[in-house]
């Protein structure tokens, strides 16, 4: 379990293809990240959220953590486009004794979205994120002023447009832009999206009209 509060931006040191993909099965990959001081207390087998994707540490050598990713995870997330030298959002799993500053984040990405527009104001930046037409039903999990996870970051939904653009908007303060990947992403870039856990369970329990 995570909270969506990013601890650090860390650099991808290497990427290798474990198994080649094709039109039916995506490639399986392994990659390593220099997680710096976040490696203290971590062990092989523990989980870290990388851009919002819950991954298991398969190797740990000093500050370098390695992860193996199956094809299904690559297909459903933005991990299909990561590059060596790129910086990613990192959060270690939450301790039971820790402060809960964000919201419940599992690290199970529901879908990806595209940054459709980026509007810069003096005190904030507004991002409009578009979700593909075939995932339009996912808007049942999105609540205005409710929580959503974008690239592992706990954020608040500002507006929803599920009629014309299949989009939602979020507002980012300078601190978030400086401390996360959303400060370096541009229009057209993909992002990982995880809908609010509570919304998903409530939607599952309630009868559909």
Named regions from a protein language model:
Residues 1-209:
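Conserved loop->alpha-helix
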């Amino acid at each position: 379990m995570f909270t969506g509060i990013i601890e650090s931006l860390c650099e991808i040191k290497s990427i290798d293809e474990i198994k080649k993909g094709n039109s039916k099965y995506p490639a399986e990959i392994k990659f390593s990240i220099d997680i710096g001081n976040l490696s203290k207390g971590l062990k092989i087998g523990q989980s870290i959220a990388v851009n919002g994707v819950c991954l298991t540490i398969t190797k740990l050598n000093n500050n370098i953590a390695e992860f193996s990713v199956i094809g299904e995870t690559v297909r459903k997330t933005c991990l299909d486009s990561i590059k060596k030298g790129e910086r990613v959002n990192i959060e270690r799993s939450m301790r039971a004794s820790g402060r809960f500053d964000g919201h419940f984040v599992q690290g199970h990405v529901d879908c990806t979205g595209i940054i459709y527009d980026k509007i810069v104001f003096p005190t904030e930046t507004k991002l409009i994120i578009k979700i593909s037409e075939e995932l339009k039903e996912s808007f049942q999990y999105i609540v205005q002023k409710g929580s959503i996870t974008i690239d592992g970051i706990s954020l608040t939904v500002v507006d929803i447009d599920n009629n014309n653009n299949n989009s939602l908007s979020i507002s980012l303060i300078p601190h978030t832009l400086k401390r996360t990947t959303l400060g370096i992403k541009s229009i057209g870039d993909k992002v990982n999206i995880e809908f609010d856990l509570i919304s998903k369970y409530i939607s599952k329990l309630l009868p559909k009209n």
